[in-house]
Each structure stands twice: as C-alpha cells, then as structure tokens.
Amino acid sequence: VHLTDAEKAALSGLWGKANADAVGAEALGRLLVVYPWTQRFFEHFGDLSSASAVMGNPKVKAHGKKVLHAFADGLKHLDNLKGTFSALSELHCDKLHVDPENFRLLGNMLVLVLSHDLGKDFTPAAQAAFQKVVAGVASALAHKYH
C-alpha cells in the first residue's frame, strides 16, 4: 500500500484514539447483520438470529477483537501486507473457504465504524488513508486465492 507521510501520520494518530476492541466487535457484528450470508462461516458462534443477538454475541465480540488485532499488526507492516497476512490468507482460502469478497465488505464496515468512533477527527483525508489500508489488507487476505 502506497501512503504519503501525511497519510501514515493520520493513520498512526487516529489508530491510537480508536477503541480497537469495540471497533472490531462492532465491525464484525455489522458485517454479519448487513450481509447475513456471511453468517454461514460463524454458525458455531451460537445465536445469530437477529441484529441484537449478533451484536450482543460474546463470540462475535471476541472474534471481532481478534480480527482488529490482526489489522493493527498490518498497520505496523504496511510495506509487506501480503507477507503479514499470508498465513491468514491460506487459512481462509484452504481451510475455511471464505469468499474473498467478504474481506472487502469487512473493511468497509471497519471504515464505517471508525468514522463513528472517531467522529470529527475522521476527516475525508483520514478516511481515504484508511480505505487504502483496508483495500490493501483485503487484497493481501485474498492473495492465496489467485
């Protein structure tokens, strides 16, 4: 992912303000509610029968936290996202058979939730930087599929 120094500074500054655990839980929960076909990968999480069930599900929250910590690791390795996410790409492709389009959808949910979480600090320029990163992460996660 090619980012300017200003974009890198914006990412770093804003990421420090975000509540990563809550953002991860909210982003994954929204993915499962807005795109219900993604729930098939999480049937073992228990009750996903309604928006409130999904958003209150402790397994969804825990996995969202895990996802966001992986994303945070990617922020530390922006010059090598494919390498950073190679094991997760292989897992999601070979074992879990996740449609790689879901990575893009989750990235969009992440940007949406960050926008809400960070409020006015999440400027259009900051959004553009985060969109670049989530697109890069989605591409890295889909790498094994090609």
From Swiss-Prot:
Organism: Microtus pennsylvanicus (Meadow vole)
Sites bearing S-nitrosocysteine, chain numbering: C93
Positions bearing N6-acetyllysine: K59, K82, K144
Residues with PTM N-acetylvaline: V1
GO molecular function: haptoglobin binding; heme binding; hemoglobin alpha binding; metal ion binding; organic acid binding; oxygen binding; oxygen carrier activity; peroxidase activity
Chain sites annotated for binding heme b: H63, H92
Residue span, Globin domain: 2-146
Record text on subunit structure and interactions: Heterotetramer of two alpha chains and two beta chains.
Entry comment describing in which tissues the protein is expressed: Red blood cells.
Protein name listed in UniProt: Hemoglobin subunit beta
Pfam families in the record: Globin
Domain of life: Eukaryota
Keyword tRNA processing (UniProt): no
InterPro entries found in the cross-reference section: Globin, Globin-like_sf, Globin/Proto, Hemoglobin_b, Hemoglobin_oxygen_transport
GO BP, sorted A to Z: hydrogen peroxide catabolic process
Keyword annotations: Acetylation, Heme, Iron, Metal-binding, Oxygen transport, S-nitrosylation, Transport
GO terms for cellular component: blood microparticle; haptoglobin-hemoglobin complex; hemoglobin complex
UniProt family annotation: Belongs to the globin family.
Function: Involved in oxygen transport from the lung to the various peripheral tissues.
